[in-house]
Amino acid sequence: MDPSKLAKLQAGARIGGKGTPRRKVKKPSKSAMSAADDKKVQGALKKLNMQNLAGIQEVNMFKEDGGVINFRAPTVHSSLPNETTAIYGKAEEKTLSEILPGILNNLGPESLTALRQMAEQLKVSEGEKGADAQADDGEIPDLVEKFDEQD
């Protein structure tokens, strides 16, 4: 065999220094880390004596700024004596307009009125922001002197 080819192969196979091969560190995968987190959550839920609520397909949480936190197929646990509910899973932030068509047929009459009030508040707050931006433009004075020049 050609000595130059042999030297190239040996140089490529050498991992560590001074003749001892070093082992590569195996990093834990993200799924293993999430499994450990799930075990911690399950332990905390057992301490509170929480029961799993099956059959919940979607959870929407409405924020004050008009956004919505949406959970598709979440895991929901609840404990009535402790007055505690735990919702966990993959969350997505959405706007009210994105989520509205899908939830209209699930809402009752009280929820519809509350939703209308939230939509009106959102429109009013957006209108105020636009008015503030226009008012701020009018308050900026014109530059009449050159302050960086010395007389």
Curated annotation (Swiss-Prot):
Any GO BP: cotranslational protein targeting to membrane
Instruction: Tell me which GO cellular component terms the UniProt record holds.
Output: cytosol; nascent polypeptide-associated complex; nucleus
Subunit structure as annotated in this protein's UniProt entry? Part of the nascent polypeptide-associated complex (NAC), consisting of ucp15 and btf3. NAC associates with ribosomes via btf3.
What is stated as this protein's family in its record? Belongs to the NAC-beta family.
Q: Where is this region: Disordered?
A: 1-38, 123-151
Q: Which Pfam families match?
A: NAC
InterPro entries in the cross-refs: BTF3, NAC_A/B_dom_sf, Nas_poly-pep-assoc_cplx_dom
| NAC-A/B domain segment(s) | 35-100
Compartments it resides in: Cytoplasm; Nucleus
Instruction: Cite the record's Basic residues compositional bias ranges.
Output: 20-29
- Write the record's keywords in alphabetical order, separated by commas: Cytoplasm, Nucleus
| The keyword Cytoplasm appears for this protein | yes
Tell me the function of this protein.
Component of the nascent polypeptide-associated complex (NAC), a dynamic component of the ribosomal exit tunnel, protecting the emerging polypeptides from interaction with other cytoplasmic proteins to ensure appropriate nascent protein targeting. The NAC complex also promotes mitochondrial protein import by enhancing productive ribosome interactions with the outer mitochondrial membrane and blocks the inappropriate interaction of ribosomes translating non-secretory nascent polypeptides with translocation sites in the membrane of the endoplasmic reticulum.
Organism whose genome encodes this protein: Schizosaccharomyces pombe (strain 972 / ATCC 24843)
Q: Does the keyword RNA-binding apply?
A: no
Q: What is this protein called?
A: Nascent polypeptide-associated complex subunit beta
